[in-house]
Amino acid sequence: MALDPGHIGPNNDPMRWGPAAVLACAAAVAFPAADATGSASQKPLTLRLAQALAVPHVLPAQSAAFAFDLTTGAAVFERNTALSLAPASNEKLAVTYAALTNLGPDYQIETDTLGQGQLVGTTWRGSLVLQGHGDPTLSQTGLAQLARQVRATGIRRVSGSVLGDESYFDSRRTAPGWKSSFYINDSAPLSALTVDRTWFHTHHSQAPSAAAASLFKDALRKQGVTVTGPALRGIANPDAQPLGAVLSPPLSQIVRFMDRESDNFTAELLLKQLGAADGAVGTSARGAAQVRATLNEAGIPLAGVRIVDGSGLSQLDRLTARAIVGILQAAWNQPELKPSFVAALAVAGRSGTLKDRLRGAPARGVVLAKTGTTAIASALSGFVRKRYAFSVLQNGHPVSSWWARRAQDRFATVLASQ
């Protein structure tokens, strides 16, 4: 499916900046070879990693670190690996693994147009329904495509309304354990039917499905289809007739945007997508249960793990360094998931949330990781070349993000120097 890099809106609002531009240009990640000119320190690796973590304003008792050699199957550093800590956006690693496992890298999310009524001549006597299934990338470009499909059926006039159906998910606009400020600043309102990440004219709509219906009515008008009735929130009848559909990009591209840019909105919709996988209404709680079940099936230790939301914004989320490294190992060892999982991570000094970190040798380009930052947590977890999986989690009230990141970067750099 072709992606339109300009459909979301002005670039000066990060909540409006959609994934399309990132998805369209993302490329497969290669692991560069080690720097042959670098000389390894004579100090034991364990000591150098411990020294890397020794920074002020970060409490060792509220920190954890784990480094694992993927080639030997041995741990090379362990500190508080079973300590239950707030993971910040490292929570997205669990959602990424569960989504790729349960849905598959090629999975696409469908948005449908349905007709309630019948076509008489060129008039649809009844209403049209725009039915969402949680596509975080749906844009006005997609609505235009749906409108063209409606016109292609011969419809030129709709006597009823345009309904926005978001019933595939529940109607909770936030996830459990969020501060009220997160709803305003860190994620658009959650819904199974959103267009342009709920941006509607000049603001984020608090009624996403009704806003989507209104935008679809406009799209129909531009295609020469007149709708007599209003745009409203509604639910499709069981006997509604399919009139068209558009698909999201593949899941592999969606998680690439989500993890590289640490996008909270996408993570929360994917969590609800997992909750709806068994035919039930998608909720954060059902999605969280599916994530936990998936981790358990992979043999990942769940003591100290609590999955509440998809993004890591919830103050109730907890992970351990051992569980995160377990997720990394599980993804690494599954050939059908590994390329998509690894490619989703930011590349040190080059892309995503690591573009301006770890820019020097030997870490640049060889550390692939997921960052995480909230007021109480900082984290960095991922891979170093094809050799190490690692996780560093640090908590505090508040945590010093500057010093925490310094420790994380030093830890990853030591591994990259091996």
Model segments located where?
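Small-residue-rich helix-loop
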Residues: V76-E78, G275-Q418
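Active-site SXXK
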Residues: G73, P87-P105, V162, L193, ...
